[in-house]
Amino acid sequence: MAIVSAPRQGRQAPHRTKPQMAAFTTLLILAAIGVLLLARDVLPGSSRSSGVQGSGVAATSTRALPNFSGIELAGSNNVTVVAGARQSVVVHADSNLLSHVTTQVKAGTLIIGDVGRFNAKSPMYVEVSVPSLTALDLSGSGNVTVTGIRASRLTVTLPGSGGISASGSVTRLDISVDGSGDAQFSGLIARNVDAVINGSGTIFVTATQSLDAKVPGSGAVLYGGNPAQVTTSITGNGAVTPG
């Protein structure tokens, strides 16, 4: 007598009831809403960005501060610096956002930052006039423009992603770029330049006597001024070239 075995049936997926399907769909919708809300909060400049909305009325605030010879940009604001007989710091922003730009002096250095979330409608920047400038530090993401500087020595550090340009003349320029920002100093005539670039940015300088350039990163140093002495040390993928 032949015995016929019945074919085995494949394992069936568990059946979801209607209440389970409804709960699952609700969770997906809530997750999608959460993602949209998060994107709204973290995208600056968006019409939906969280925080204080600018009034659209441009205003200024003149800050009374102790004397300083160094400037540190810790926020995302743009800063213009000019050589002047008198020291002054003027903040430009929407009338209701002036307090979001912070200015304080510590150990002879003006520190410019910003606090809170906001969506500016009017141009937001800081104007600085200083009789003597010896140091610049761009740890934030803003941009700095310096004009008319005359100094025996200027030290510049750029660890952030911002950019800086400068014009004038100095005896010695020490500049270090650790981030991805660019330093446009071809308009600043320096007798001696010491340039170090650890990041991926670019340094433009004009050296009339000597240039000491170190490039352990992937950035580049481009120089003009036809210096009599050029010393280079390249250990990364970067370059030091006249241009």
Regions found by a protein language model. Give the residues of each.
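Short acidic/polar N-terminal linker immediately downstream of export determinants
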Residues: 2-99, 109-129, 238-243
